[in-house]
């Protein structure tokens, strides 16, 4: 009787541990480097940019930045990103500043800079490499 109870308790603990481990793997893949890339292209809507982004080798999807200037890429935007599945990912206030032939970008959430990047214009767009800022 004791051994049957012990086996049931052991299997219950094993099942609980396995499900927690699976959830951790699904939400945060191991070895994801803190580096991303985004390509912004002009939308037909004035002051709007379409985005195609990726983070490390684990996440990617589309996005849309609104509220910017009608000419060029520099300006202040509100950007929303989505996963390839269509599920919402993140949203930020995005500041893009031009300096000669290069650009500096800052993604701001809740009044704090969450990510920074640098980029340059490419054919039909603005390419930016970025990383999350450590707390």
Predicted regions and their residues:
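Positively charged n-region of N-terminal signal peptides that target proteins for export
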Residues: 1-4
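Central antiparallel beta-sheet cores of small beta-barrel/beta-sandwich binding domains
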Residues: 22-135
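Bacterial N-terminal signal peptides
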Residues: 7-15
């Amino acid at each position: 009787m004791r051994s049957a109870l012990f086996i049931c308790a052991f299997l219950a603990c094993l099942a609980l541990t396995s499900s927690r481990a699976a959830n951790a793997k699904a939400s945060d893949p191991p070895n994801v480097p803190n580096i991303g890339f985004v390509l912004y292209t002009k939308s037909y809507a004035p002051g709007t940019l379409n985005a195609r982004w990726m983070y490390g080798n684990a996440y990617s999807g589309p996005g849309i930045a609104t509220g910017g200037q009608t000419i060029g890429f520099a300006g202040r935007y509100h950007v929303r990103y989505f996963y390839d599945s269509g599920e919402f990912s993140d949203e930020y206030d995005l500041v893009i500043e031009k300096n000669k032939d290069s650009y500096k970008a800052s993604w701001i959430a809740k009044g704090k800079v969450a990510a920074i990047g640098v980029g340059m214009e490419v054919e039909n767009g603005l390419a930016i490499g970025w990383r999350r800022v450590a707390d």
